[in-house]
Swiss-Prot record:
This is Oligoribonuclease. HAMAP family: Oligoribonuclease (MF_00045). 3'-to-5' exoribonuclease specific for small oligoribonucleotides. Disulfide bonds: none annotated. Pfam families: RNase_T. It comes from the Bacteria. It comes from Pseudomonas syringae pv. tomato (strain ATCC BAA-871 / DC3000). Its EC number is 3.1.15.-. InterPro entries: Exonuclease_RNaseT/DNA_pol3, Oligoribonuclease, RNaseH-like_sf, RNaseH_sf. Residues 7-168 form the Exonuclease domain.
Length: 178
């Protein structure tokens, strides 16, 4: 059910860091309420890319996405970039009115750059503001360095979103004073 207080969490995995030369290979979304309770998990989508495109990945991406099985899932996927955008939009429209939720995640500006370049309708659905958990991570590192949130490193989109939500809960409990 749509609620303008719900939050849209998104994570992308890409072939690299440059939205002009690299592409999205996986995406996932989660909807939470304003208290960070998960309401729904959206589709986890491996976006098909050609072997030629995948061969252009640098060593880190080749090793990471190959080791996690993502590269193989991308090769086997039949879902195009446009289909992935449409599926994700259909999901979030069930939960959040247009332009009411900031884009939520970790280092979310990078994801937003890729959405702007490759999935403009989806990028435009978000409010112009960002809810970037990495901002709190940077502030905590400087103002409360004893606070450490331990993250995994699967670099799979759904796992990364779950960790981002857990990390924001951690900072809410231990860093943000009521």
């Amino acid at each position: 059910m749509q609620n303008k207080q719900n939050l849209i969490w998104i994570d992308l995995e890409m072939t690299g860091l440059d939205p002009d030369t690299d592409v999205i290979i996986e995406m996932a979304t989660i909807i939470t309420d304003s208290e960070l309770n998960t309401l729904a998990e959206g589709p986890v989508i491996a976006v098909h890319q050609s072997d030629e495109t995948l061969a252009k990945m640098d060593e880190w991406n080749t090793r990471q996405h190959g080791g996690s099985g993502l590269t193989q899932r991308v090769r086997e996927s039949t879902i195009s970039m446009a289909d992935a955008e449409a599926q994700t939009l259909a999901f979030i429209k069930l939960w959040v009115p247009e332009r009411s939720s900031p884009i939520c995640g970790n280092s979310i500006c990078q994801d937003r750059r890729f959405l702007y370049r490759h999935m403009p309708a989806l990028e435009n659905y978000f409010h112009y503001r960002n809810l970037d958990v990495s901002t709190l991570k940077e502030l905590a590192a400087r103002w409360a360095p004893e606070l450490k949130f331990k993250k995994g490193s699967t670099h799979l989109a759904l796992d990364d979103i779950r960790e981002s939500i857990a990390e924001l809960r951690f900072y809410r409990e231990h860093f943000i004073k009521p």
